[in-house]
Amino acid sequence: MEFLNHRDQQRTNTTNHFDLTDEAVYNFHANLLIACANSLLKHQGKQFVVDDTNKQILRFLLYYFNDCPLAEEIEIKGKTHKLGRPILLNGYVGAGKTLIMDAFALYLKYTKNQNAFLSTSMSEVLNYYKINGHLDEYMYRVGKNSIDGNPRAICINDIGLQQQKYFGEDMQMIVNDLMFARYEIWTQTGLCCHLTTNLSPKDMKQVFYDSNGRIIDRMKIYNVINLTGESRR
């Protein structure tokens, strides 16, 4: 990537397992993450800002995505979170949720991290369904080099915006099926479906309500993290 010199590129390309308990290693990766975020903001002429609203969240996520046990010691608003469980990042519009997850997607890809994920949006997911009539690309990916499927970790940004109909078909039911499938994938493989949303936990319960409470019950596996602050747009 153009924002790293040759020596730094060698440093990240030699391994995909890093010991972030070493503060020097942590600082290197924190700077790399910021560089990834800045590369995403370059066309807007902006710089990524680390401040009191996101600093602790970024530290947790850097530990988390590198499987560092220190992740479970980080307190965010008095709460700790678990390794291995998917992330649900919520907050107001413009707080920077999608940018953070997009930056991590780029960072994890570049460092060849086994926790790398595809970052997409709810609108992209629904458009895929409207074109193809299914969501297999975001589920098991049957036929992708294996008759048993080849699922991958993903992050769906802006979940909760799917309350619409398409030729009379309820998109909420389609998303519910997706969430069921992603829960099964997580229990079987450990591959996560991370989420960002503008909705509060209370609003999420209303959006994903079903008579048996199955969706909400499965969403209890999530590390729910609230990103506060004014709009950064």
Residue locations for each model-derived region?
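Hydrophobic anchor at the beta1->P-loop junction of P-loop NTPases
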Residues: 89
